[in-house]
Design a protein with these regions (language model features):
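Short glycine/proline/serine/threonine-rich loop/turn segments at secondary-structure transition edges
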Residues: 60-63, 103-108, 212-226
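Extracellular recognition modules
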Residues: 112-114, 228-232
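Catalytic cores of secreted or luminal carbohydrate-active enzymes
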Residues: 128-151, 488-493, 498-658
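Beta-strand-rich binding/interaction modules
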Residues: 78-80, 165-201, 209, 550-572
Length: 658
């Protein structure tokens, strides 16, 4: 039976691989901590060293010992007792080493990892400066599995619905199988205490089993039902190994007019996610990876996430399964494709990404094109063929650099960073895709188009939020666009020639600490589970030029918005789903108490007061001709308007939306 021991403690570290490792650290660990901003990113590029003792019990003789690193960025050379045993050249996928024949039993052994984090490495995602930092360190879990010589290596489950009935085909790979050994599988609802329902037996040398279930519940974004598939290895009737594989039964289909899950059309409304955090880069524990998924689904209200530029944490993907959050999983890289050695490594990365993650029901697309890279049909065909071989049921995509490029993927993806900056909020499908019969996805928008800091003035933060609102609303209206992904969930560290010159790209709808900006509300108002009401303004006259309030918007998922002044109603606004409400009346019927003015004058005065509140100045008053606001009235001079402005606007103790 499997015995897993986590090895996240007792590590020693040195920033120089040639010196003794003396600094005590725990995993996850970053090779270099940074300030929040204004730092030299080259300081995290090094050949560093990690060391740890590992006592191997004498009773483990005859077992198989498997040492796994879930994430070591970026080129890892592993030594056991000074003997080189493995080299792994990807910082974003896990690797497992069979150390059975490399350890001494009944003794303390020493694990040493020489980690090269330099961006000069000839491996993805490196080759030219991307906008994100890749950091360095052993930043995901490390553990040792103690198994029998004959054990289960992998369980791959494919789900289908022929004639509407759920069917699963599982392929089990067994290490050192014997002819008489059998595989037994059973299934039950995840989290249930009920007994497993047996679904069949098969010889370990065959390893493939199919079974049907009539009463299965499908995995849905709003009801992400999961099942535990138990796979047991039986030798002479005795269980020698057990693996629990969590699966979800669902059908994902990409058509020219949209994305369909279990036959129902879903508009993908998501954000791109970077796994970076302040100070420590990638080195955050599983709890924070899980929290990011929680934020995306429960706080921001998105239904999808693009795990951009590299494969992300198993803990993050597991939580997406549990939440019903749809995922695009992506190979490492951005813009650059290197030489043959670089390409071969990317093929290996693709293989590892798919083999390690293909049982996740949340993953609906493999993004297998180096994002925004120049066209390389031969290379792209090789990756595409590999993906289809390893996972025939899941569609593929890839972010294209330009419109109308040749596509080998199932879904054409394009970063429309011009969206929201022109007349039509985003490009039409016909402007981008080479074949209108293929599905089209906006893989990124926003970001560099309109960065905004949390500390920027209200107008800047509102501008970013309105861009998101306009694009999201436009995508909702385009029936032949699968959906869109805003860039980005959070701000993130970048190279000097990107971002704002302080090593941060302020592209997020949240800051690096996961505090929401106003743009977050552009997503939040699409969900109905939690009431949302967010004002774009503090209603402070000192915030904007000319002692004005500027443009004031309310983001809400209510059907109707009402505003009040000191408990008295001002105005009522109808709300368009997914769009903010512009608040342009701060007076309402307050002027009814001013009996010295006619109804027409009160109407014009209200327009004047609201205009000055928003812009800082009155509209032109042409007193000599008896005109006020372009209409003939009894004369109302500017001093009277100023007096009323001070009374009803400056004297306002607070606009209250409801």
């Amino acid at each position: 039976m499997n015995d897993r021991k986590y090895l996240n403690n007792e590590w020693k570290f040195s920033e120089d691989a040639e010196t003794d490792a003396t600094v005590s650290v725990r995993i996850p660990h970053t090779c270099k901590e940074f300030p929040y901003h204004y730092f030299n990113e080259s300081k995290c590029q090094m050949r560093c060293k990690y060391e740890r003792p590992l006592f191997i019990l004498d009773e483990w003789k005859g077992k198989t010992l498997l040492l796994t690193f879930e994430g070591a960025a970026h080129n890892a050379e592993v030594f056991i007792n000074d003997e080189p045993v493995y080299e792994h050249r990807c910082g974003y996928t896990a690797f497992t080493i069979d150390i059975t024949d490399h350890v001494e039993y009944g003794k303390s052994n020493r694990i040493r990892v020489i980690l090269d984090t330099r961006e000069s490495l000839n491996i993805p995602p490196f080759g030219e400066h991307s906008d994100f930092l890749a950091y360095g360190g052993i930043y995901r879990d490390v553990y040792l599995d103690v198994k029998e010589k004959m054990h289960i290596q992998d369980v791959y489950v494919r789900t289908h619905f022929p004639s509407g009935r759920a069917q699963a085909i599982s392929r089990v790979k067994v290490a050192n199988p014997e002819p008489a050994v059998q595989i037994r599988q059973g299934i039950r609802l995840h989290g249930s205490d009920n007994d497993y329902t047996d679904v069949g037996y098969v010889s370990a040398t065959k390893g493939t089993m199919a079974f049907s279930m009539g009463s299965i519940r499908r995995w849905e974004p709003d009801d992400p039902v999961l099942y535990d598939l138990r796979t047991e290895l039986l030798a002479e009737g005795k269980v020698v190994d057990t693996v629990i594989t969590r699966v979800g039964f669902r059908e994902a289909e990409f058509r020219k007019d949209g994305f369909y899950l279990n036959g129902k059309k879903i508009k993908l409304r998501g954000l791109c996610r970077s796994q970076a955090f302040p100070y420590v880069g990638y080195a955050m524990p599983d709890s924070m990876q899980i929290e990011d998924a929680n934020i995306l689904k429960n706080e921001l209200g998105v239904n999808a996430v693009r795990a951009a530029n590299y494969p992300q944490s198993p803990a993050f993907l597991n939580r997406c399964d549990e939440l019903g959050l749809l995922v695009i999983c992506e190979i490492p890289g951005s813009r650059y494709i290197g030489n043959i050695k670089w390409k071969n490594q990317e093929l290996q990365n693709t293989k590892e990404m798919i083999l390690q993650n293909r049982n996740h029901p949340s993953i609906i697309l493999w993004s297998i094109r180096v994002g925004e890279s120049e066209e390389d049909d031969d290379f792209n065909q090789r990756i595409s063929g590999l993906a289809r071989k390893l996972d025939p049921d899941r569609a593929t995509t890839g972010v294209h650099r330009k419109p109308k490029e040749h596509m080998v993927e199932d879904v054409y993806a394009y970063n429309d960073f011009g969206a929201g900056l022109k007349g039509a909020a985003c490009c039409r499908k016909s402007e981008v895709i080479p074949d209108m019969e293929k599905p089209y996805l906006i893989s990124a928008f926003g970001g560099v188009s309109y960065p905004a800091k949390s500390g920027d003035d209200e107008a800047r933060r509102l501008g970013q939020a309105l861009l998101y609102s306009n694009v999201l609303h436009d995508v909702e209206q385009q029936v032949d666009v699968l959906g869109s992904f805003g860039w980005n969930m959070t701000d993130y560290n970048a190279h000097q020639n990107y971002g704002s010159g302080d090593r941060i790209c302020y592209h997020g709808v949240m800051d690096m600490f996961r505090n929401p900006k106003l743009a977050a509300a552009a997503y939040q108002i699409y969900q109905d589970e939690v009431p949302v009401l967010e004002l774009s303004s503090s209603l402070s006259f000192g915030e904007n030029p000319m002692h004005s309030l500027g443009d004031v918007y309310a983001y809400t998922n209510a059907d109707v918005l009402r505003t009040y002044r000191n408990g008295e109603p001002i105005q009522e606004y109808e709300v368009t789903k997914g769009m903010p409400v512009r608040i342009d009346d701060f007076v309402g019927n307050c002027l009814d108490a001013e009996s010295d003015f006619t109804e027409e004058q009160r109407k014009e005065i209200r327009n004047q007061l609201n205009h000055k509140a928003c812009t800082g100045s009155f509209m032109e008053v042409r007193e000599k001709k008896g005109f006020f606001g372009g209409k003939k009235t009894e004369s109302v001079d500017e001093s009277t308007l100023t007096r009323l402005y001070e009374k009803y606007i400056l004297g306002n103790t607070g606009l209250v939306p409801e």
